[in-house]
Amino acid sequence: ALGPVAGMPAARFVASHFRVMTKETAQILVAGPAVVERAFGKKMTKEELGGSEIHKLNGVTDNVADSEEDAFLQIKSFLSYLPQNIYELSEKVDCNDPIDRKEEELLSIIPKDRKRSYEMRDIVKLVFDKDSFFEMTKFFGKGIITGFARINGFPVAIFANDSNFYAGSMSAEGAQKTSRFIRLCDTFRIPIVSLVDEPGFLIGPDAERAGTILHGTEAVLATTESKVPWTTIMIRKSFGVAAAAHYGPDGYVLAWPSAESGPLPLEGGVAVAFKKEIASAKNPEAKRKELEEKMAKNQSPFPRAEAFSVHEIIDPRETRKYIALWAERIQSQLKASLMNR
């Protein structure tokens, strides 16, 4: 959208695969200021009703452009990852970025203090082809990161958690964003790379009012119904029902040594499972810490690998190589999936 859009044109805008509107000049409206004033007796400008600052936060627009030129450049970037139509696959481009490139920074990017946040986008930039990441819907459902990138020239979808917002928990908004993105990838047969640091669904009264369990379950269903190849890299946390949204059918699962998983995060799980034991202890706080340290050993990636629920535990510096080789292997699978159209 480059200017004011209301009614049916606004509906066409939100029905698009990629939605971008220009800052200040574009507004998306169900009805304009005159209709709103007549109905509610309230005077508002088009920008106050449906400007980019409103719609980048509620998910109506995926991206905001600084100018018309920027809008067209974003559209061009988005289309570069897609095939010509749904009966073809996206093209691989020439790549001078070696698949065995190792970034030492990946060894220290995850804080030793598991409660501290870090920049997941930095991991994306270090692992995938240089300058290839195109993010969508950044300001809606901020705990979830979605976008496209390339690995050894192959286009892939990026689905990740941002620990800077709600520790990466999946909110109702994040779940809606997830469902739509996975279905977009299904439509155009773009394989998904999931970088997991998922503590679970967002909890609390606001989360319940937002219908988090409803939208979260729909996100999990979108994953289970997905028809594209998935690879999941367990970066750190992978807990609860929400974690299921990060593991596609027959996916290729890798884990960093920093990965931890289970039905509940350590702190909440210990508090619930050992409530009486902690309360009856002479020093409840010391008992709680003792139990948490004991249970933490069971949440490491090594028991999962021994049970074959993780294909490999990898050196973080080799993440690029593993994903690149996977992207090469799945090309025949993607071609076969077109036969079912």
Q: For the regions a protein language model found, what residue spans apply to each?
A:
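Ligand-binding clefts of soluble mixed alpha/beta catalytic domains
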Residues: 1-341
